[in-house]
């Protein structure tokens, strides 16, 4: 039997019986099993909100408000363009940032690195941001570390991103 699951599927695609009948990645009956208490989700439906780029800029304030303390590991700074100060900051520092939609929609725009765009691409991105500023977030660029990786029969240095999660237990975080 399974006690706890860690989802790697979009919320909307978790259960084709209850959520999206066209979803191929989900587990039929998952929502019913969760409702009935037969399985727990380590990252419950709806928890993707916390990983939303639009929410990232508010995580330090949420931690202070809910926990009364600062984050042990800082989040990358981000600025929501739906606020006038955020929009002006993002447009003024466009080449120093990564720009991404507040909510990632399958088939929709992903993230943009403005300094890598040609003039036409950059202008198009600025126009999209100005047209619907609340849909966009600017985030500081995270310089990635490199680690040895196996590629084509040889070891090469390649960029690596490591995402870690912690779980709260009665004995403390694990």
Which residues does each PLM region occupy?
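Domain-scale recognition of functional cores that engage charged ligands
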Residues: 1-174
